[in-house]
UniProtKB/Swiss-Prot annotation:
It is an enzyme of class 2 (transferase). Residues 39-179 form the PADR1 zinc-binding domain. Residues 182-274 form the BRCT domain. Involved in the base excision repair (BER) pathway, by catalyzing the poly(ADP-ribosyl)ation of a limited number of acceptor proteins involved in chromatin architecture and in DNA metabolism. This modification follows DNA damages and appears as an obligatory step in a detection/signaling pathway leading to the reparation of DNA strand breaks. This is Protein ADP-ribosyltransferase PARP3. Residues 449-568 form the PARP alpha-helical domain.
Length: 815
């Protein structure tokens, strides 16, 4: 076996221990805390605790720590912890801190949320337990519950030099009370060095840092970080900057100080890094710690490294030698994994492959790390002479990182998630669209060689370009270049859907409040971002976030996966006309409308009447029509069938360009879930609007991508329409009855201007006016159809968003 490349993974624990050592020292010297109302039972009016001042207690604890460190060996500390039913594992620092806290202040009671163990982390008491196999508990407190019972001292300690000191605190009534209060300061225990011309003077920052618990150091040695101005970087820096880089001391922007003070928590230093790309190796900043704007730039320029189940990971460079994924007995030895547990600071991916190159040379590739942080990833590429040995090592690694057996997963998809272990991303056998679709250089050539009508060829060029899918995944935060999120199996998508629906049902009937309710949301968040690996994970807090970042995102990923299968691999020659090939796979007919036709003029009028400018910041965007395409798709009922149905209305539907290939092949799919939020409040329905403004708000993505498409559909609302003025508590009855539903918005189209188009199709074309429903959660009227056979995509309106000079009514939207 030859090892070609190795990198050691730099664990966060080491850094945490350094920080906590400083924090513990600071905490031991003095507890600079405010008096808390919670201390009323043990504090006297003069601020004394059990007859001692806070400073006195802190000094006593400091002396106690010195004595126990000197006279109590680590093994005896472990014995004490075990005798009292506490965890005796961990680093020397953790064991010492845990034992000293127990002996001086008394045994900690269990976490009130998950019944796990509480532990002091240098700033507060945090829980080390788990809500579930997916999520660690994030409960924390500054005033932990203590057991009012004597400490158990094992025989090995009874006759030790420290026994008299320890027995002094055995009786609960003699113990000092430790309450960290609410006045913990963000820079407690930190030494901060300043350099260069900052926006405020060094004197100002020295005073401010000291006010918030820190100290300012003139020397870089021993500093937590160096705060410098960007100008220092541009000038190449000084000896102080060079020394900080040599000593691997973080160099951060001034914004780190500002944000840490504002949030009253020290912010992650790597997110404010100023110089990592100047160092020889490059430290690498994980994407989830970067500014979203900087992360977006990296994402859009990044190449997808793993495109699917047969994809050889790009960094191995073995695909250039003709490398292919090793296959035996129907199993492809290529696995990708994800784990997200924000309570433990985890948001990692893992890739594991067996790759065979010509002449039957076999390689095992393994990589584990964080997106964007390659220098700190654990990575190795090994050549194996023995196939069975390589297979055994692959299986061993799978079991090590997941806690599950390999074959039951690959053959039957049997898998049980284990705490802090990885979960497989079930890749499909295909080529993800960020790899297989047309790159910028190929777009023009592909359209030139296309046999389709020029306007249709240009339309297909847009839908077959990498760009729209890269942007869509970047905007959703599912743009990890190391995992093919746009090429996962239907089984994986179904697992995501099941987890989402189960959570929504749970939260709708939730009776818990406070930390226990937060735990339900936190648990779902970790499940979700493990299954759907994100470069920007967070804890969901409300229904709107669920709608935007889970439901809509899952629908988007589902549609991008379908686009990946349709587009396949266009990376080769474009002379073979890949655009026409994809067009054939759609099984639909697309034709550009003549701009002088009645249909074209009617649609432009309908758009102009029911549109309101999209607002981004202080800028408003109008819209102009570029082209209109008539569509006949096999995924929808035919025109002949739809016109036989009652109460037909021409309505607008919002869509992103990245959703369109799936729409054109499969037709509309209903919303994935029911939420009391616009777009999802009608349950699993196809939702349309009589206002182009609503569709435009959904279709607008960003000012640097002004082109988009609005969908016009014919929907049969049926003879009976149910009007809902508030979100229904349960939409399942509506789904079962399959009746048409209308949700009145704050604005409606002027009914006096409505007209009937051909074949008795109503067109609610009228200027937008205020309705009688100003308390509605909807801005515009929305209509819901529950039967796919009652909605037909008829037109795609290609639009361009343009900055407006004059002010008008606006739609608030996020860029």
């Amino acid at each position: 076996m030859k090892v070609q490349e190795t990198r050691s993974h730099v664990h966060a624990l080491g850094e945490e221990e350094k920080v906590m050592t400083r924090k513990q020292k600071a905490e031991s010297k003095a507890h600079e805390v405010e008096h808390s109302p919670k201390k009323a039972k043990v504090e006297k009016e003069d601020g004394h605790i059990n007859g001692k001042s806070e400073t006195g207690v802190a000094e006593e604890y400091d002396e106690f720590c010195k004595a126990t460190t000197e006279h109590l060996p680590l093994e005896q500390m472990r014995d004490i912890l075990e005798a009292n039913g506490l965890d005796s594992s961990g680093s020397d620092l953790e064991i010492t801190r845990r034992c000293q806290d127990l002996l001086f202040y008394g045994a900690l009671d269990k976490c009130s949320v998950c019944n796990g163990s509480l532990e002091f982390d240098g700033r507060r008491y945090v829980c080390r337990g788990f809500y579930s196999e997916w999520a660690s508990c994030t409960f924390s407190t500054r005033n932990p519950p203590r057991k009012q019972e004597p400490i158990k001292l094992p025989d090995s300690v009874q006759n030790s030099l420290a026994s008299d000191l320890l027995k002094k605190y055995q009786d609960p009534s003699h113990r000092p009370h430790r309450d960290l209060g609410l006045a913990e300061k963000p820079f407690t225990g930190m030494m901060i060095s300043l350099m260069g011309r900052l926006t405020r003077t060094h004197h100002y920052w020295k005073t401010t840092i000291e006010k918030h618990g820190g100290k300012v150091a003139n020397s870089i040695i021993g500093s937590t970080c160096l705060v410098a101005s960007p100008a220092e970087r541009e000038r190449g820096g000084t000896s102080k900057l060079a020394e900080a880089m040599e000593r691997s001391i973080p160099v951060v922007r001034e914004a780190w100080l500002i944000d840490s003070i504002e949030k009253q928590e020290p912010q992650p230093l790597e997110a404010y890094d100023l110089v990592s790309d100047l160092s020889v190796d490059g430290k690498g900043i994980p994407w989830d710690k970067q500014d979203p704007g900087e992360e977006a730039i990296e994402s859009l320029s990044a190449e997808l490294k793993l495109y699917g189940k047969r994809g050889v990971y790009k960094d191995t460079k073995l695909q250039e030698q003709g490398g292919k994924i090793f296959e035996r007995d129907g199993i492809l030895y290529n696995c990708a994994f994800s784990v997200c547990d924000q309570g433990r600071g985890l948001n990692d991916y893992c890739v594991m492959q067996l790759i065979v190159v010509p002449e039957n040379r076999l390689h095992l590739y393994f990589k584990k790390g964080r997106v964007g942080d390659d220098p700190n990833a654990e990575e190795r590429l090994e050549e194996w002479d023995n196939v069975d040995g390589a297979l055994k090592e692959f299986v061993r690694l799978f079991e090590e990182i997941t806690g599950n057996e390999f074959e039951p997963w690959e053959r039957e998809k049997k898998f049980q998630k284990k705490p802090l272990k990885f979960y497989p991303i079930d890749m499909d056998d295909g080529i993800e669209v960020r790899h297989g679709a047309l790159g910028l250089r190929q777009l023009g050539i592909a359209a030139t060689h296309c046999k389709l009508e020029p306007l249709v060829a240009n339309f297909m060029k847009v839908l077959c370009s990498q760009e729209i899918y890269k942007y869509a995944l970047m905007e959703m935060g599912y743009d990890c270049p190391d995992l093919p999120i746009g090429m996962v199996t239907n089984l994986h998508l179904k697992k995501c859907e099941d987890v989402l629906l189960e959570f929504i049902d749970k939260v709708k009937s939730l009776k818990e409040t406070g930390p226990k309710a937060e735990a339900v949301w936190t648990d779902f968040s970790q499940r979700w971002f493990t299954l759907m690996h994100s470069t920007r994970p967070f804890n969901f807090r409300d229904y709107q976030e669920i709608a935007d970042h889970a439901a809509a995102a899952l629908e988007g990923v589902r549609d991008i996966t379908q686009a990946s299968h349709l587009i396949g691999d266009m990376t080769g020659s474009t002379i073979d006309d890949p655009l026409s090939e994809t067009y054939k796979k759609l099984g639909c007919s697309i034709s550009a409308l003549d701009k002088s036709s009645d249909d074209y003029e009617m649609i432009v009028k309908y758009l102009e009447k029911t549109y309101e400018p999209v607002k981004v910041g202080d800028i408003e965007y109008g819209v102009s029509v570029e082209n209109i395409f008539a569509v006949q798709t096999g995924g929808c009922p035919s025109y002949e069938d739809i016109i036989k149905l009652p109460n037909k209305v021409l309505l607008w539907c919002g869509s992103r360009s990245s959703n369109l290939l799936r729409h054109l092949q499969k037709g509309f799919l209903p919303a994935i879930c029911s939420l009391p939020i616009p777009g999802y409040m009608f349950g699993k329905a196809i939702v349309c609007s009589d206002a182009a403004a609503e569709a435009a708000r959904y279709g607008f993505t960003a000012v640097d991508r002004p082109e988009g498409f609005l969908v016009l559909a014919i929907a049969s609302l049926g003879n009976e329409i149910t009007e809902l003025k508030t979100p229904p508590e349960d939409a399942s009855s509506l789904e079962e009855k399959k009746v048409g539903v209308k949700g009145p918005g704050k604005k409606k189209t002027d009914e006096s201007e409505h007209f009937v188009w051909k074949d008795d199709i109503k067109v609610p074309c009228g200027k937008l006016v205020a309705s009688d429903h100003q308390d509605s959660p909807l801005e515009y009227n929305e209509y819901a159809v529950y039967d796919k056979k009652r909605a037909r995509i008829s037109y795609l309106v290609g639009v361009k968003y343009e900055e407006k000079e004059e002010k008008g009514a606006v739609i608030d939207t996020a860029e």
